[in-house]
C-alpha cells in the first residue's frame, strides 16, 4: 500500500468513528428524552427536595435535568395561628446557660459589628439575639467614638441565638438607636426609634415591612425597652418613655396587632421614673420590671392587662437591685415609692414566682461589674430581705452591663408553662477601658428544675485591639 492509500484509509476510518460517535450521542439523547420520562419512575430527573439549614429553615425546590440543577427559593411558610402565651411562668430552681456569643473575642479578627443593647426574643420555632449596631466593625477606624448612644448609623439587626453579631449572618430589622422586638406566632414585630432628640420617631415593622409610626409626644428622646416586647394571643405590648432621664418624664404602654397600633394608655406615675422595662407574659398579663434613672435604687414594677389597664409601683423586696446602690443592710424596701436616693441606673429585670421574686443585679454596688441573680421570699409583695437562693453568672472581676428578660414559649419547650430566661450584656471598651470604641457581648441563661453552680461566663476578650494602638 502506497503512502496515498494509507492516508486515505486512515482518514476513512477516522471519519467513520466520528460518524459512529455522533450516532451514539443521538441515540442516547433520544432515549433520555423520549423513553425514560415515560416509564413512571423519574428518579432524580425531576424531583423536589426539602432541606433544613441550621440558621433558618429554607425550602429549596431542586429540579435536576441532564446534570443541571435549577434551584428555586421558596419563602418559608408562615404559621397560621398566634401564640397563646397565657400560661404561668415555670418555677425555676436555678438558671442554666443557654447561649454565649463571644462577639468581641471573635471580632478581633472577624467581621463583627460594634454593638450595644443586645437582647433575646423567641418565636414558636427559634430564638434570636437582637442588637443595636453602630454601623461599624470591631477593630476598624469607624469604631472610633462608638460610646455615643444615638447616631444616624445605628440599626437594629438580629442573628440566631448563639451566633456572634457578624456581617454574614446578621439580618437587618430597623433603623434604630432604641428598639424592641417580639413574635406573635405568625411574624416578627420590631420597633425602631431613630431621628433627632426633639422629634424622634418609632417605626413599627411587621414581617419586615413598616406598618405604623409613633412620633415623639414630649420632644425629649423618645425611647423604648431595649429588650423583648410581649405578645399574648396575637396582641403585642410594649412600654415607651419620652422626657428627662433625671426627673419626671412621660410614660405610655402600647398595644398592636399585626403591626398596627390598636391601643395606648398614659401611665400616671408622679414621683416615679420608668425606663427600659424588661417585660414577660405571666398568666395572661404583661409583667415588667424597669429602671428608675431619677432617684430609686429599687426597680419600678408595671403590670399591664389586655385592656391596657395597669398597676404601677416598685419592687417590694427589701434588697435593692439597681446600680449604683447603697448597702443591703441600710436599704428599706417599698412597694409604692422610690427608695435609696441614688440617681442614674442600669437596665435590669425580675421574675415573679408566686409571691417570691427572682431579681438580677450587678455584684458591684457602684459600677457595672459582676452579675448575680437572687431569689427573695415574698419579695413581690413584701419588703422582705430573706434571700433564699443566689447564683453568680459573672464574677466581680469582670464587666457586666444591661440585663433583661424573655420567655421560651410552649411551642418550643412542649411544657405547660413559660420558661423564664434572662440575658446579661458584658460591655467592653470605653469608658472603663483604654480603647477608641465601646461594644458588648452577652450570656443567656434559662430557668431549670435544678440548682446551678456559681461560675463566671464573662466576655474574655483581651484588649486593647490593634486599632487602639495606632
Curated annotation (Swiss-Prot):
Specify the protein's topology with respect to the membrane.
Answer: Single-pass type II membrane protein
The cofactor named in the record is: Ca(2+)
Q: How is it modified after translation?
A: N-glycosylated.
Name the InterPro entries for this protein.
Glyco_hydro_34, Sialidase_sf
Q: What ranges does the Virion surface topological domain annotation cover?
A: 36-470
Source organism, top-level taxon: Viruses
The segment annotated Hypervariable stalk region runs over 32-86
Entry binding sites for Ca(2+): 292, 296, 322
Record note on domains: Intact N-terminus is essential for virion morphogenesis. Possesses two apical sorting signals, one in the ectodomain, which is likely to be a glycan, and the other in the transmembrane domain. The transmembrane domain also plays a role in lipid raft association.
Official protein name in the record: Neuraminidase
Tell me which species this is from.
Influenza A virus (strain A/Turkey/Canada/1963 H6N8)
The gene behind this protein is NA
Amino acid at each position: 500500500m502506497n503512502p496515498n492509500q494509507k492516508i486515505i484509509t486512515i482518514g476513512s476510518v477516522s471519519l467513520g468513528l466520528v460518524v459512529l460517535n455522533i450516532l451514539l450521542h443521538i441515540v442516547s439523547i433520544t432515549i433520555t428524552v423520549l423513553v425514560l420520562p415515560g416509564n413512571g419512575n423519574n428518579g432524580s430527573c425531576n424531583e423536589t427536595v426539602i432541606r433544613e439549614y441550621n440558621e433558618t429553615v429554607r425550602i429549596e425546590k431542586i429540579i435536576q435535568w441532564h446534570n443541571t440543577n435549577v434551584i428555586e427559593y421558596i419563602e418559608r411558610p408562615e404559621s397560621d395561628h398566634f401564640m397563646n402565651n397565657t400560661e404561668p411562668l415555670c418555677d425555676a430552681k436555678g438558671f442554666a446557660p443557654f447561649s454565649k456569643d463571644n462577639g468581641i473575642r471573635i471580632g478581633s479578627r472577624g467581621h463583627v459589628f460594634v454593638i450595644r443593647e443586645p437582647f433575646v426574643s423567641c418565636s414558636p420555632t427559634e430564638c434570636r439575639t437582637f442588637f443595636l449596631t453602630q454601623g461599624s466593625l470591631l477593630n476598624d477606624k469607624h469604631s472610633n467614638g462608638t460610646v455615643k448612644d444615638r447616631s444616624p448609623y445605628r440599626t437594629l439587626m438580629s442573628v440566631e441565638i448563639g451566633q456572634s453579631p457578624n456581617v454574614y449572618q446578621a439580618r437587618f430589622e430597623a433603623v434604630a438607636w432604641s428598639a424592641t422586638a417580639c413574635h406573635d406566632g405568625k411574624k416578627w414585630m420590631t420597633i425602631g426609634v431613630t431621628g433627632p432628640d426633639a422629634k424622634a420617631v418609632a417605626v413599627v415593622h411587621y414581617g419586615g415591612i413598616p406598618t405604623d409610626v409613633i412620633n415623639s409626644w414630649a420632644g425629649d428622646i423618645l425611647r423604648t425597652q431595649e429588650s423583648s416586647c410581649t405578645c399574648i394571643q396575637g396582641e403585642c405590648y410594649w412600654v415607651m418613655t419620652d422626657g428627662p432621664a433625671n426627673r419626671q418624664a412621660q410614660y405610655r404602654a402600647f398595644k398592636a396587632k399585626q403591626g398596627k397600633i390598636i391601643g395606648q394608655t398614659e401611665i400616671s406615675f408622679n414621683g416615679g421614673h420608668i425606663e427600659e422595662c424588661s417585660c414577660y407574659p405571666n398568666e395572661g398579663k404583661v409583667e415588667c420590671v424597669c429602671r428608675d434613672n431619677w432617684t430609686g435604687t429599687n426597680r419600678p414594677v408595671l403590670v399591664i392587662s389586655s385592656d391596657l389597664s395597669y398597676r404601677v409601683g416598685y419592687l417590694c423586696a427589701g434588697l435593692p437591685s439597681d446600680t449604683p446602690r447603697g448597702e443591703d443592710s441600710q436599704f428599706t424596701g417599698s412597694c409604692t415609692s422610690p427608695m435609696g436616693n441614688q440617681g442614674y441606673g442600669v437596665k435590669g429585670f425580675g421574675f415573679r414566682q408566686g409571691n417570691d421574686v427572682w431579681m438580677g443585679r450587678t455584684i458591684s454596688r457602684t459600677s457595672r461589674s459582676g452579675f448575680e441573680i437572687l431569689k427573695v421570699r415574698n419579695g413581690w409583695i413584701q419588703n422582705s430581705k430573706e434571700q433564699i437562693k443566689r447564683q453568680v453568672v459573672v464574677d466581680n472581676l469582670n464587666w457586666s452591663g444591661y440585663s433583661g428578660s424573655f420567655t421560651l414559649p410552649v411551642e418550643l419547650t412542649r411544657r405547660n408553662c413559660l420558661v423564664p430566661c434572662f440575658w446579661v450584656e458584658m460591655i467592653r471598651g470605653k469608658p472603663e477601658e483604654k480603647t477608641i470604641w465601646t461594644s458588648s457581648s452577652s450570656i443567656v441563661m434559662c430557668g431549670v428544675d435544678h440548682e446551678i453552680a456559681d461560675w463566671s461566663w464573662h466576655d474574655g476578650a483581651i484588649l486593647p485591639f490593634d486599632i487602639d494602638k495606632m
